[in-house]
């Protein structure tokens, strides 16, 4: 009879660390943000490293002995098109197979304010488990609500709050008006340019 075998776990040592590498520690998935090998004058060498929890986005500073072993995981990013939400789930379409998958809002969190229908998003997987959704780095949106600009407003003249079509509120230059299209950096939530 056929018996399922567990795949061998890929382990790496601290000597193999690279920024962006995926790790599984105590059942949670992380990516290495930065690391530093330290060789003090006395005592053994150690490694200081910063990892980011791929589910909640928190970063954690850690220290371990040089040569410590960790479970390495392959992080896979799939491009999917955001279609719509029905209130309970967000629906994405695989751009290669056209399969639609529902995603719980717990995977999206604060990033919901950058989701715009038909935009291509990055869905991050490890061990075939969805870890999170990243909107495009830049989105092109319309300003749906803001105070009107007035003659004499310049690029140097400060900013004002504006609501964009996704529902997010961002700071925009004083000269922009409702109905204008702009480009926004979703990583910082800042205005980039008028379109």
What residues fall within each predicted segment?
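Short, Lys/Arg-enriched N-terminal segments with co-localized hydrophobic residues
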Residues: 1-8
């Amino acid at each position: 009879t056929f018996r399922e075998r567990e795949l061998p776990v890929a382990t790496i040592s601290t000597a193999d660390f690279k920024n962006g590498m995926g790790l599984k520690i105590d059942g949670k998935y992380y990516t290495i943000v930065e690391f530093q090998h330290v060789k003090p004058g006395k005592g053994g060498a150690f490694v200081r490293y910063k990892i980011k929890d791929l589910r909640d986005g928190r970063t954690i500073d850690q220290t371990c002995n040089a040569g410590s072993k960790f479970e390495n995981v392959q992080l896979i990013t799939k491009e999917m098109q955001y279609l719509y939400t029905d209130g309970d789930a967000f629906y994405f379409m695989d751009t290669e197979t056209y399969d639609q998958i529902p995603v719980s809002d717990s995977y999206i969190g604060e990033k919901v304010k950058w989701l715009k229908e038909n935009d291509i998003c990055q869905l991050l997987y490890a061990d075939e488990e969805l870890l999170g959704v990243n909107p495009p780095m830049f989105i092109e949106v319309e300003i749906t609500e803001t105070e009107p600009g007035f003659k004499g407003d310049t690029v140097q003249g400060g900013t004002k709050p504006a609501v964009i079509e996704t529902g997010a509120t961002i700071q925009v230059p004083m000269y922009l008006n409702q109905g204008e299209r702009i480009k926004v950096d979703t990583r910082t939530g800042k205005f980039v340019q008028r379109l």
